[in-house]
Amino acid sequence: MKDITTWIDEYQKGSRFGLKGKVLLKKNSKFQEILIIESDYYGKALMLDRCWMTSMRDEKYYHECLVHPALSSIKEKSRILIIGGGDGGTARECLKYSQVEKIDLVEIDEEVIKASKKFLQEIGGTAWIDKRLTIHIDDGVKWVEKAKNNFYDCIFIDCSDPSEFSNLLFTDTFYKECKRILTQKGILATQSESPESFKNIHIHILKSLKKVFKLSETMYSFVPIYPSGIWSWTFASKGELNLSTPCCNEVTTIEKGCDIWNLNFQNAAFKMMPNKIVKELNS
């Protein structure tokens, strides 16, 4: 790969979001184009099909917001399922909890994991060698369909934006299957897109989860390299869902190890739903 510094951009609806840097890896897998760059400001970053997935500088905005509201709010968290998550960041955050005994990480594209292990070592960290983590190169939808009833305490949907091979992860049918394999007091956590750049998808996810699950709540925060900068995560349960009061005696220790997440941050983020989204959900 030539040592050339240039602008690498993601294009969305007449807008572009770019980082200046050098391309370290450009590879086409069976599913998508994988691009790793070394950027001037955000460090190493991952693109899939020319969409930003993560960067060294801002990845904790995403991973900490996806994981900790869920795991801090449930008592039982021994069995965890991650759909996607090939950069290793979600697994890393989950493994901070001593109660976690087993994580199944189901990633459809093995090349994403290989690229992340080679170029984004700091994101996955020691998660890749933790014996509690088992990696499965498989289709997440099919994995969920085959899983036992009431098996997982927490399911994380850490996937890319809807595409030819990920569209089924955003359907009522898939959410119903996730509900089936969750324990009664378990929780589902999913990235739920941007209320600005991907408003229609965002609304669809929120409405689908409200339809399928008894309870669901959405929080908003920032992921600087994502289109518009504002992002969301939605949490759903078929039983209890108390996201304001932690059920975990490790919270204080975990807060100290986080760059972004703490309970005050979380509680404020759950109150940030834009009014235009409120009106659409109530229409």
From Swiss-Prot:
It is an enzyme of class 2 (transferase). S-methyl-5'-thioadenosine binds at Q32, E107, D139, G140. PANTHER family: SPERMIDINE SYNTHASE (PTHR11558:SF11), SPERMIDINE/SPERMINE SYNTHASE (PTHR11558). It catalyses: S-adenosyl 3-(methylsulfanyl)propylamine + putrescine = S-methyl-5'-thioadenosine + spermidine + H(+). It is found in: Cytoplasm. GO terms for cellular component: cytoplasm. InterPro entries: PABS, PABS_CS, SAM-dependent_MTases_sf, Spermi_synthase, Spermidine_synt_N, Spermidine_synt_N_sf. It comes from the Bacteria. Its EC number is 2.5.1.16. It comes from Prochlorococcus marinus (strain MIT 9515). GO terms for molecular function: spermidine synthase activity. Keywords: Cytoplasm, Polyamine biosynthesis, Spermidine biosynthesis, Transferase. This is Polyamine aminopropyltransferase. Homodimer or homotetramer. Catalyzes the irreversible transfer of a propylamine group from the amino donor S-adenosylmethioninamine (decarboxy-AdoMet) to putrescine (1,4-diaminobutane) to yield spermidine. The active site is at D158. Belongs to the spermidine/spermine synthase family. Pathway: Amine and polyamine biosynthesis; spermidine biosynthesis; spermidine from putrescine: step 1/1. Residues 5-238 form the PABS domain. HAMAP family: Spermidine_synth.
